[in-house]
Structures are given as structure tokens and as C-alpha cells.
């Protein structure tokens, strides 16, 4: 069953500059020409033979002479796959097996994401959100936060620091509002207490004013009646 070519390999081949290489022309049949050098005498003797896309199992088999352009495609694909294998820590044998199968190169990780993919970025955001919650960021000191951020990306570190600063400012503003509200309630309670005291004092002043008027009226009657007139015992009632 024929396997489709790897999109990653084809993209690399499309970006590969072939103009700097000379295409080897094969002599046509029946035309005399210089003998063609075998692959054993070329610099590519260490490269395994090029497999066909329709027969991936023929990598190690001996094949006939191929056109130069197909060899360049094969070398570009092999170099790209082997370079990806070395970057991922794969051995040359594993890279060759991946090349034979024409499958995507796996990436080490808990979910097998590709580097820089949206899935990997989303998983990293989730892990950091679980590790650095809002409460943890607020209670954490700057030194502790810098120590915890070692190994994180620069963008993630800046985002978490900005998040902590925002939470700190928000908490400070909320604390100020709560303090002002508490002071306002205290002042309103004090105002109500003083108003009640003022009303009580006004009532007391009114009572004293009535008593003053009563005593003044009695004094006026005593003054108008003159000395020795009548029995003054009624003044003490």
C-alpha cells in the first residue's frame, strides 16, 4: 500500500535551494560516453539508498541508477529528518525508521504535542494557572515569585508578574474602600449618637425654661402683693 509523502519533508524540499547544485546527466542508452561513477566512489556513499514512496521497505535493497534530482530530494528529506531526530534526542536508527514509515516525528511530552503548537501552549497556561493561583500570587513575595519562575518563558514570567501587580493594586484599592466604608459607618453612628444627645439636651433646656417661667411668675405675685399680706404658705405648695 503506497504511503503519502510527509508534508514536513515536502515543505523542506520546497524551501531547499536546488540551484546551487549541478544536476548529473545520465548518458542515454546506445550513446557512448564516460563511465558513470558508482555511488561507492561519491561523497554520498554513507547515505542509504533512496526508498521509493510506493515501496518503503526497499530502503536497504540495491537499486539502479536514479536521476540526480531525485537523489537531491532524498538527501534533503534525509537531512531534515535526521536533524529533527537529533534535536529530539532520537538515534539515527530511530530517525531512519521514522523516515521509512513517512510518519510525523513524535515529541516527548505528556500528550504528544508538537513544539509551539496551540495545544502545548494551552497546556502550559493551564499548568501555570494551577500552580500560580490568584491567592498564591498575592501572598507570594517578589523574591519567592522570581524563584518559582525560574525555567518559565519570558512572556509567561512577565504575564504572571503583571497579574500579581494587578491583584496587589486591586487588593489595595479594595482595602482602602473597605476602610473608608468602615470609617463612614463609624462617623454615621457617632453622628446619630450626638444627635440623640442634642435632642435630650434640648428637652432638658425646655423643661428648665418652663420651671424658670413658673418660678418667675410666683416671684412676681409675691412682689405685687406686698409684705405681710396674706398667708405665704401657698407659695410653698
Swiss-Prot record:
Changing residue 160 to P has the effect of: In RDCP; alters phosphorylation; no effect on subcellular localization; loss of transcriptional coactivator activity
* Region feature (Minimal transactivation domain (MTD)): 30-93
Look up the record and give one Gene Ontology term from the biological process aspect: positive regulation of gene expression
Any one GO MF annotation of this record: promoter-specific chromatin binding
The answer to whether keyword Repeat applies is no
**Region (Basic motif) spans which residues?**
159-185
Disordered: annotated segments: 23-57
Annotated consequence of substituting residue 67 to S: In RP27; no effect on phosphorylation; no effect on subcellular localization; no effect on transcriptional coactivator activity
Summarize the impact of residue 50 to T.
Answer: In RP27; decreases phosphorylation; no effect on subcellular localization; increased transactivational activity; increased transcriptional coactivator activity
Q: What Pfam families has UniProt attached to this entry?
A: bZIP_Maf, Maf_N
- Fill in the PTM field for this protein: Phosphorylated.
Tissues where this protein is expressed: Expressed in the brain and the retina. Expressed strongly in rod and cone cells (at protein level).
Domain comment from the record reads as follows: The minimal transactivation domain (MTD) is conserved across the MAF family, it may activate transcription by recruiting TBP and associated factors at the promoters of target genes.
Membership in a protein family: Belongs to the bZIP family.
- The protein's role, per its UniProt record: Acts as a transcriptional activator which regulates the expression of several rod-specific genes, including RHO and PDE6B. Also functions as a transcriptional coactivator, stimulating transcription mediated by the transcription factor CRX and NR2E3. Binds to the rhodopsin promoter in a sequence-specific manner.
Q: Which PANTHER family match?
A: NEURAL RETINA-SPECIFIC LEUCINE ZIPPER PROTEIN, TRANSCRIPTION FACTOR MAF
- What protein name applies here? Neural retina-specific leucine zipper protein
**Provenance organism:** Homo sapiens
Amino acid at each position: 500500500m503506497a504511503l503519502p509523502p510527509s508534508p514536513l519533508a515536502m515543505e523542506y524540499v520546497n524551501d531547499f535551494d536546488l540551484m546551487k547544485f549541478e544536476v548529473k546527466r545520465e548518458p542515454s542508452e546506445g550513446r557512448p560516453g564516460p563511465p558513470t561513477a558508482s555511488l561507492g566512489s561519491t561523497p554520498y556513499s554513507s547515505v542509504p539508498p533512496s526508498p521509493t514512496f510506493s515501496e518503503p521497505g526497499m530502503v536497504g535493497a540495491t537499486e539502479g541508477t536514479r536521476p540526480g534530482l531525485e537523489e537531491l530530494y532524498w538527501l534533503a528529506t534525509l537531512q531534515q529528518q535526521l536533524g529533527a531526530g537529533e534535536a529530539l534526542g532520537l538515534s539515527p536508527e530511530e530517525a531512519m525508521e521514522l523516515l521509512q514509515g513517512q510518519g510525523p516525528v513524535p515529541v516527548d511530552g505528556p500528550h504528544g504535542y508538537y513544539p509551539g503548537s496551540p495545544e502545548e501552549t494551552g497546556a502550559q497556561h493551564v499548568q501555570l494557572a494551577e500552580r500560580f493561583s490568584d491567592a498564591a500570587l498575592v501572598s507570594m513575595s517578589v523574591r519567592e515569585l522570581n524563584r518559582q519562575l525560574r525555567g518559565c518563558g519570558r512572556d509567561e514570567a512577565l504575564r504572571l508578574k503583571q497579574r500579581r501587580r494587578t491583584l496587589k493594586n486591586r487588593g489595595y484599592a479594595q482595602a482602602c474602600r473597605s476602610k473608608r466604608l468602615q470609617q463612614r459607618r463609624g462617623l454615621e453612628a457617632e453622628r446619630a449618637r450626638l444627635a440623640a444627645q442634642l435632642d435630650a439636651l434640648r428637652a432638658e433646656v425646655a423643661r428648665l425654661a418652663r420651671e424658670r417661667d413658673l418660678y418667675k411668675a410666683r416671684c412676681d405675685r409675691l412682689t405685687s402683693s406686698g409684705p405681710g399680706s396674706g398667708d405665704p404658705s401657698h407659695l410653698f405648695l
